Amino acid sequence: MQLLNFGLLLLPFVAGDLAPQPEPLLAGPSDVVPGQYIVTLKEGLTSAQIRDHKKWVSSVHRANLDSFAAGASGVETEGIMKHFHIHDLNMYSGGFDEKTVEDLSRNPYVKSVHPDQHVYLAKTVTQRQARWGLGYMSSKGKPVPLHSTLVDYSYDDKAGEGVWAYVLDTGINVNHVEFEGRGILGHNAIPNKPHTDEFGHGTYVAGIIAGKTYGVAKKANVVSAKAFDTGSSTYNYILETYDWIVRNITDSNRKNKAVINLSISGAKYQPFDDAVEKAFKAGITTVVAAGNDGKDAKNNTPASSPNAITVGAVRWENTRPSFSNYGKLVDIWAPGELIKSCWKGGNNATSTQSGTSAASPHVAGLVAYLMSIENLPSPSAVTARVLNLTIPNLVKDAKDSPNRVAYNGIQERKFKLPK
């Protein structure tokens, strides 16, 4: 069975360091949650078949617990825990003994059984400069001064108004002044933890999407969907949160006015790639980070989900930072080094960070921005428009990636500029 290390994508660096290096992803047996699994069911099952399958699982699990073989494992298991339904994809998490896992893997209704994983957050260090990223988004890829605060960012004054950006992350400080009351507490999957952001990552990402100073879509709403806390998470919580987001977007009838940002990455994990793909088929746009391994993104999840918008990081002078993943699955490049945004520790707190965690929300913000000013009825239309606006052949050392830099299209439209 596949092992996975899965984490948020901000990189550690010290003040003055302009070439931060990524921490290695350390996958190993200790990452596995003992006795806990994610089970994916085959497509096309009826509600009655799924209900009967769950009854069968409970019966088999109970019988195996009564046997000596199950008790000998030393792991307490609790059976089915949570069910996830994304479009026509059905999965569930559960605590099972080894014999039950063997029985599940042979069940005709089961597509796959994967061990659940701990998910680790990258360490970050504060560095106090840089505001180049926004200016880059409206400059057609023209190199901009790194530390200048005078770079112009031109945009239509609708600026994401009436659009919802869902941030699956560590939570958001919705009281931060940058959000001007547009922050919403959506879902908290972490048990016995408040719906706050004690780590900073989610607030930082949300600020790049929709902060009044640091955001691409300055009037968009940001919805906190907390699947991480301080240090680690598992797919049990990540899938629960992603499932909630898809349901909330669908039930609120806002598929063409919503975007999901996933500034997370780990080794290839098919069940979650499948979930992102099913959301796309349901009419929902997801923007994801390419990853910080300095390798081909095809081996990362959710970057390898074929219809997510996968974002690599570019520096202010159009070079690829050594940490950014690359490859044919990287759809677009956006600012991802020394980017300033909101932070933990207070309603005015800020921090400057690097990583594809910063690049992804630039594009999620661009999606929200475009949704507010154009009729983009489907994820395919969103992706096509975002890619149509890109500036080609600017990124040095893009490897074999599509060489396309994010751009908001302002110079091609007679938009009213902000006051």
Curated annotation (Swiss-Prot):
Protein's recorded name: Subtilisin-like protease 2
Residues covered by the Inhibitor I9 domain: 36-122
Annotated gene: SUB2
Keywords from the UniProt entry: Glycoprotein, Hydrolase, Protease, Secreted, Serine protease, Signal, Virulence, Zymogen
Similarity field: Belongs to the peptidase S8 family.
Signal peptide (residue range): 1-16
Top EC class for this record: hydrolase
Peptidase S8 domain span: 131-419
